[in-house]
Regions:
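ATP-dependent carboxylate activation and anion-phosphoryl transfer catalytic cores
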Residues: 6-7, 263-348
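Phosphate-binding site of ATP-dependent enzymes
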Residues: 18-19, 156-157, 166-168, 179-269, ...
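Anion (oxyanion) recognition and catalysis
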Residues: 27-28, 116-117, 164, 280
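Short glycine-enriched loops at secondary-structure junctions
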Residues: 127-131, 243, 292-295
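Rossmann-like NAD(P)H-binding beta-loop-alpha module
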Residues: 144-167
């Protein structure tokens, strides 16, 4: 199997990233794993997608640091590959990372991924599905039963009324963004500072005002979903809990949250079942659900991370489960002579 990974920038990849772990799992099973940045893609006069890509030497990697050193260093194979010749292309770049410094790069993976998809490459997650999820408004397309009450606006008065209706406690965050950046917890005693919070967020666009869930004090759970089902391998769920530190309401790891073992309950599995039809419809192969209590806080479809954290607590290499699924998809395409739409193949 020839698999490609599109990332923001090869040289900023880290050994703990899920993309790095997936590439190692693929190489260790004898597959070709090519990595390319969003700036490395091209559409040539031959009407094919090409990319300046890197591949680490084929060997049995036991160290992620060694793999990444090989990939980013002189030992790597550096070639201008034909992306159309790949079996699978995984879009693992995070558009929000490029929003300010490289706005042109936000849609690059999706744009080139669509062409590769039309040329017969299995592109995951489905680029047309990803285009619907370019901001957090996508979350509002899922049933209201699984979401906190939400207002999305730039109007300060509307936000104040909404917060008041919620009893003075709410969460404010930007419509576009990730990593826990620009997230505020508004409490009744914060009323004098509410205008300042709103002004800070409206400078960058729309604001999401959201019901605060008291269970958030215990942190949230990241549960992976693959092919529309909870990712389970060797009897273990790919999940972990993120616990906030001190008075910081954000449990996101990038914002200083700590990781703990997660216990997956029937409530969590029911949430997956409720959102499954939409994820399947949009061709979302690998997704991270962020759960607080009996509600979803976020559905992460762009480069969801944390498989390594789940492995730490469950002692199971979930990356192998993902590669297993990719191998099956490639086999299906061969058996049926590529007689499947990408969105169908994404969750088979």
């Amino acid at each position: 199997m020839r698999i490609g990974f599109v990332v923001n920038d090869i040289m900023t990849e880290e050994s703990g990233y899920t993309t790095t772990r997936l590439a190692i799992a693929a190489i260790n099973r004898g597959h070709e794993a090519w990595v390319m940045g969003v700036a490395d893609l091209a559409y040539d006069p031959d009407e094919k997608i090409h990319a300046r890509a890197r591949s680490a030497p084929k060997r049995n990697y036991k160290s992620r640091d060694t793999y990444l050193s090989d990939l980013q260093g002189k030992k790597a194979r550096v070639e201008r590959i034909t992306v159309d010749d790949l079996d699978v292309l995984m879009l693992r770049n995070d558009p929000s990372t490029d929003a300010i410094a490289r706005p042109w790069a936000q849609n690059a993976g999706i744009i080139f991924g669509r062409v590769a998809m039309r040329h017969g490459v299995i592109v995951l997650n489905d680029p047309n599905g990803l285009s619907k999820a370019m901001n957090k408004m996508y979350f509002q397309l899922f049933p209201a039963d699984v979401r906190p009450k939400t207002l999305i606006t730039r109007d300060a008065d509307e936000i104040k009324r909404f917060v008041k209706d919620l009893g003075g406690t709410a969460v404010l965050k930007p419509l576009q963004g990730s990593g826990g950046v620009g997230v505020f917890l508004v409490r009744p005693e914060d009323r004098p500072n509410l205008n300042q919070m709103i002004e800070s967020l409206t400078r960058d666009g729309y604001i999401i005002a959201q019901e605060y869930l008291p269970e958030a004090i215990q942190g949230d759970i990241r549960l992976f979903v693959m092919n529309g089902r909870p990712l389970r391998y060797k009897g273990k769920y790919a999940a972990f809990r993120r616990v906030r530190t001190g008075d910081d309401m954000r449990s996101n790891i990038h914002a200083g949250g700590r990781k703990r073992e997660a216990e997956i309950t029937k409530t969590h599995l029911k949430l997956v079942e409720i959102v499954r039809p939409k994820l399947v419809q949009d061709g979302m192969f690998l997704v991270g659900l962020d759960i607080v209590g009996d509600k979803l806080m976020e559905i992460n479809v762009f480069s969801p991370g944390g498989l390594g954290s789940a492995q730490t607590f469950e002692r199971v290499n979930f990356n192998n489960a993902v590669i297993d699924a990719l191998e099956r998809k490639v086999d299906y395409m061969k058996y049926y002579r590529r007689n499947f739409d990408n969105v169908e193949m994404a969750t088979l």
